[in-house]
């Protein structure tokens, strides 16, 4: 397993990161080597066999919009009180497709600001501040390896309810999930809007499992 050692600007210790690039489509230009997988169904065992500090999950078809996006995610992921960290996913119209998950809705989980224009003025400008959320998308997620394994990794969802589920499992052990607006990704709409990137259109089996669990 190849690893990336990222030296956070205000830390003296290098952080070892494994990037898991998943899904179909071209890989974005990344500042790191990656493990390429077709889906996340067997990723739990892969992470168990690494000795990295943190794991970055990245969906093919995403393009970074912020230069220091890895450091931005890492500065929160390395905190002892934090579980999952994610950022905004924007479509080709500059509208939000994801900005952190909320739960307790008919679709299992819904994204904050979904469909809203990036340059709009949402309530309290919540798209522009670092804040706590219930969960973040597995399309762009960083989490410490020990936390990922301690909560059992990803549950077997076909949709991105896996991201909301992982966030809830982190909350259950007292950890926060963080949304930062400074690690944004542009989505290739030919690939990244298709399930299982987001929770829209989740299979009935996923919804049933999610409701029974939470």
Report each predicted region and the residues it spans.
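A recurrent flexible, glycine/aromatic-enriched loop bordering the glycosyltransferase active site
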Residues: 104-146
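Short beta-strand segments
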Residues: 21, 59, 86-89, 179-181, ...
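N-proximal low-complexity "stem/linker" segments adjacent to membrane-targeting elements
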Residues: 1-31
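Short beta-strand-to-loop acidic/aromatic patch adjacent to the donor-nucleotide binding site
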Residues: 52-65
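Active-site nucleotide-sugar/metal-binding loop of Leloir-type enzymes
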Residues: 43-54
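Active-site-adjacent helix/loop segment of glycosyltransferases
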Residues: 1, 165-214
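Conserved donor NDP-sugar-binding/catalytic core segment of glycosyltransferases
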Residues: 62-106
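A short, conserved alpha-helix in the catalytic core of glycosyltransferases
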Residues: 70-73, 131-152, 157-184
């Amino acid at each position: 397993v190849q690893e990336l050692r990222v030296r956070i600007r205000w830390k003296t210790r290098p952080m070892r990161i494994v990037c898991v690039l998943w899904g179909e489509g071209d890989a974005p230009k990344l500042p790191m080597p990656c493990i390429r997988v077709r889906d996340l169904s067997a990723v739990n065992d892969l992470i168990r066999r690494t000795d990295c500090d943190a794991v970055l999950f990245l969906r093919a078809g995403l393009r970074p919009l912020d230069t220091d996006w890895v450091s931005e995610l890492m500065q929160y992921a390395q905190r002892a009180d934090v579980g999952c960290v994610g950022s905004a996913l924007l479509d080709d119209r500059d509208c939000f497709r994801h900005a952190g998950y909320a739960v307790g809705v008919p679709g299992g989980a819904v994204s904050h600001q979904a469909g809203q224009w990036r340059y709009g003025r949402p309530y309290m400008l919540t798209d522009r501040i670092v804040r706590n959320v219930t969960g973040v998308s597995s399309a762009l997620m960083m989490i410490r390896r020990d936390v990922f394994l301690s909560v059992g990794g990803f549950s077997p969802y076909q949709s991105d309810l896996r991201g909301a589920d992982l966030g809830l499992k982190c909350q259950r052990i007292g950890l926060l999930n963080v949304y930062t607006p400074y690690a944004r990704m542009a989505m290739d709409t030919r690939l990244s809007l298709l399930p299982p990137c987001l929770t829209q259109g989740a299979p009935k089996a996923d919804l049933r499992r999610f409701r029974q669990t939470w």
